From Swiss-Prot:
Pfam families: GoLoco, TPR_10, TPR_12, TPR_7, TPR_8
GO BP annotation list: cell division; establishment of mitotic spindle orientation; G protein-coupled receptor signaling pathway; maintenance of centrosome location; mitotic spindle organization; neurotransmitter receptor localization to postsynaptic specialization membrane; positive regulation of protein localization to cell cortex; positive regulation of spindle assembly
Protein name: G-protein-signaling modulator 2
Organism, as annotated: Homo sapiens
Domain GoLoco residues, every copy: 489-511, 544-566, 594-616, 628-650
Function: Plays an important role in mitotic spindle pole organization via its interaction with NUMA1. Required for cortical dynein-dynactin complex recruitment during metaphase. Plays a role in metaphase spindle orientation. Also plays an important role in asymmetric cell divisions. Has guanine nucleotide dissociation inhibitor (GDI) activity towards G(i) alpha proteins, such as GNAI1 and GNAI3, and thereby regulates their activity.
Alphabetic keyword roster: Cell cycle, Cell division, Cell membrane, Cytoplasm, Cytoskeleton, Deafness, Membrane, Mitosis, Nucleotide-binding, Phosphoprotein, Repeat, TPR repeat, Transport
Modified positions (Phosphothreonine) in chain numbering: T486
SUPFAM superfamilies: TPR-like
Intracellular or extracellular location(s): Cytoplasm; Cytoplasm, Cell cortex; Cytoplasm, Cytoskeleton, Spindle pole; Lateral cell membrane
Binding site for GDP: R608, R613, R642, R647
Other remarks in the entry: Dysfunction of LGN is associated with the phenotype of multiple micronuclei due to chromosomal mis-segregation and defect in cell division through mis-localization of mitotic spindle regulator protein NUMA1.
Keyword Transit peptide: no
One of the record's GO molecular function terms: identical protein binding
């Protein structure tokens, strides 16, 4: 009888465990199905439910971690993606799954790349590559090479965006990163060609062409994009075909073959309309407008820019609308229609002010100044002078769009300026601002505001008081003046480090302080007594060593809490059997821990700490109707050369070495430009 009861209990336990396992696996499979169908948000819910149920199967749990990380990546929740890929890496490493470790390292690298942590991403992707080569996994090796190319490509682009540099003109570190991307893409291309993977070849050709384009290797870019176009046509991939046409147009622009570029842009426009992608259609119109501007066919340029403007208004893209107004102003100026040019320059100024685009605002002011100089009008630096009796084509009518998301006219100028002109415009037109110089007396105020603390004076002693519950704290005037002799640079940085340590104590853990005279053992935001300081004693405290010991202990415990262990891996149900297996793997593994693996862990922990301590960088936003690969530099050079050809070489009077002012210079050039623009208008 007793044996039967024991047998029944074992059977019941087996069935319960089987049902739980089936439930976890079924939830995970449903989550995978939903993600594959494109509903990643619903898929995440099922994966999270599977984690809540838990499983003893370590490989199943690793697969769930990987899928969850990928789903969160697709949903742009990169912090969650990083967390689950990190769990996946830890678990794969623990159970000795090298293939899983390679894939997890690659996924971590892709996530870190998107977060802008390129050096950490390179370490992870290199780990992926090393393991794949060790296992002779050609497919994994190809993916790792492609990922490394992507990371170096993104790194180069991120460094190469400080200003309106010409394509191919980069600092040495940017060029090195882009060249490394080319090398990895070419290795990837050779490998996927040997494997016969045509789809992967298409991706490699596309990225290789884009990287050559950035490096200024436009012939190589054309060759790569032509191959990308052929493969896209093989697969019937209209979106990839459209991108290839657009990239070919961009490359031919910089090769000076504008007619060829216009043909590719027209094919891009046709495919965009077939795909019913209004934003891409607007981008194509914008590119065609600029191309016909370079061809000096201003009537066609205006036609395409008006189409771009109409779609930008339809899509509420203020960035694109401002860019269209800038282009239309240039085209109308070239035709000698200064009234229309004035109107669009004013619209450009209005939009630049609205979106807070200072460079675009300066450009619009310069355009208005030149136009008004030609028309003999006076120019006000404070208000835009709206031109009168200006009739606008009916196709421009539309609802005023909402505020755009990003600055569109970064560091842009319409024409080349003399140093004198730039200097005068900077001083006369731009708003005057006082330089922001941190005075010694302001350093404590800065730290004080940063920490949410304030100073209170009790006789001669200044003690940091807790002000965490108040919204704004201002220091009385009598307490703001602190001489530079009282607190020097070393004192300031010492005080800053103490404030930071106090902030860490408040937010992160409860310190078990040694030799502490306070009775309370709970976390307190009030600083210890060693933080007390008088104005007559040095800032450095005799208890610095004790404080640093406490700080090191706090940090080490916090890092230990964050590191993944088997007890805090979500979804892992440990039984006696699995616990013994894990213990055996941890204690009896004779293989020394790989330094690269720990390097990855440390870098990932650093990324997590950085994410927790500071706000993430602002998301890169862009106008949907403006192409990513814009060729403003070529347009500006063309405009500048045209202006230079029209201008006269002024003979400087020996007796007037510096009397010839900016006003005289602008007036002479404006009159000449007015005459020449009239001739061009007559020719057209």
């Amino acid at each position: 009888m007793e044996e039967n009861l024991i047998s029944m209990r074992e059977d019941h336990s087996f069935h319960v465990r089987y049902r739980m396992e089936a439930s976890c696996l079924e939830l995970a499979l449903e989550g995978e199905r939903l993600c594959k169908s494109g509903d990643c948000r619903a898929g995440v819910s099922f994966f999270e439910a599977a984690v809540q149920v838990g499983t003893e199967d370590l490989k199943t749990l690793s697969a769930i971690y990987s899928q969850l990380g990928n789903a969160y990546f697709y949903l742009h929740d990169y912090a969650k993606a990083l967390e689950y890929h990190h769990h996946d890496l830890t678990l794969a490493r623990t159970i000795g799954d090298q293939l899983g470790e390679a894939k997890a390292s690659g996924n971590l690298g892709n996530t870190l790349k998107v977060l802008g942590n390129f050096d950490e991403a390179i370490v992870c992707c290199q780990r992926h590559l090393d393991i794949s080569r060790e296992l002779n996994d050609k497919v994994g090796e190809a993916r790792a090479l492609y990922n490394l190319g992507n990371v170096y490509h993104a790194k180069g682009k991120s460094f190469g965006c400080p200003g309106p540099q010409d394509v191919g003109e980069f600092p040495e570190e940017v060029r090195d990163a882009l060249q490394a991307a080319v090398d990895f893409y070419e290795e990837n291309l050779s490998l996927v060609t040997a494997l016969g993977d045509r789809a992967a070849q298409g991706r490699a050709f596309g990225n290789l062409g884009n990287t050559h384009y950035l490096l200024g290797n436009f012939r190589d870019a054309v060759i790569a994009h032509e191959q990308r176009l052929l493969i896209a046509k093989e697969f019937g991939d209209k979106a990839a075909e459209r991108r290839a046409y657009s990239n070919l147009g961009n490359a031919y622009i910089f090769l000076g073959e504008f007619e060829t570029a216009s043909e590719y842009y027209k094919k891009t426009l046709l495919l965009a309309r077939q795909l019913k992608d209004r934003a891409v259609e607007a981008q194509s119109c914008y590119s065609l407008g600029n191309t016909y501007t370079l061809l000096q066919d201003y009537e066609k340029a205006i036609d395409y820019h008006l189409k771009h403007l109409a779609i930008a208004q339809e899509l509420n893209d203020r960035i694109g609308e401002g860019r269209a107004c800038w282009s239309l102003g240039n085209a109308y100026t070239a035709l000698g229609n200064h009234d229309q040019a004035m109107h669009f320059a004013e619209k450009h100024l209005e939009i630049s002010r609205e979106v807070g685009d200072k460079s675009g605002e300066l450009t619009a002011r310069l355009n208005l100044s030149d136009l008004q100089m030609v028309l003999g009008l006076s120019y006000s630096t404070n208000n835009s002078i709206m031109s009168e009796n200006t009739e606008i084509d009916s196709s421009l009518n539309g609802v005023r769009p909402k505020l755009g998301r990003r600055h569109s006219m970064e560091n842009m100028e319409l024409m080349k300026l003399t140093p004198e002109k730039v200097q005068n415009w900077n001083s006369e037109i731009l708003a005057k601002q006082k330089p922001l110089i941190a005075k010694p007396s302001a350093k404590l105020l800065f730290v004080n505001r940063l920490k949410g603390k304030k100073y209170k004076t009790n006789s001669s002693t200044k003690v940091l008081q807790d002000a965490s519950n108040s919204i704004d704290h201002r220091i009385p005037n009598s307490q703001r003046k602190i001489s530079a002799d009282t607190i020097g640079d070393e004192g300031f940085f010492d005080l800053l480090s103490r404030f930071q340590s106090n902030r860490m104590d408040d937010q992160r853990c409860c310190l078990q302080e040694k030799n502490c005279h306070t009775a309370s053992t709970t976390t307190s935001s009030t600083p210890p007594k060693m933080m007390l300081k008088t104005s007559s004693v040095p800032v450095v405290s005799p208890n610095t060593d004790e404080f640093l010991d406490l700080l090191a202990s706090s940090q080490s415990r916090r890092l230990d809490d964050q590191r993944a262990s088997f007890s805090n891996l979500p979804g892992l149900r440990l039984t006696q059997n699995s616990q013994s297996v894990l213990s055996h793997l941890m204690t009896n593994d004779n293989k020394e821990a790989d330094e690269d693996f720990f390097d990855i862990l440390v870098k990932c922990q650093g990324s997590r700490l950085d994410d927790q301590r500071c706000a993430p960088p602002p998301a890169t936003t862009k106008g949907p109707t403006v192409p990513d690969e814009d060729f403003f530099s070529l347009i500006l050079r063309s405009q500048g050369k045209r202006m230079d050809e029209q201008r006269v070489l002024l003979q400087r009077d020996q007796n007037r070495d510096t009397d010839f002012g900016l006003k005289d210079f602008l007036q002479n050039n404006a009159l000449l430009e007015f005459k020449n623009s009239g001739k061009k208008s007559a020719d057209h």
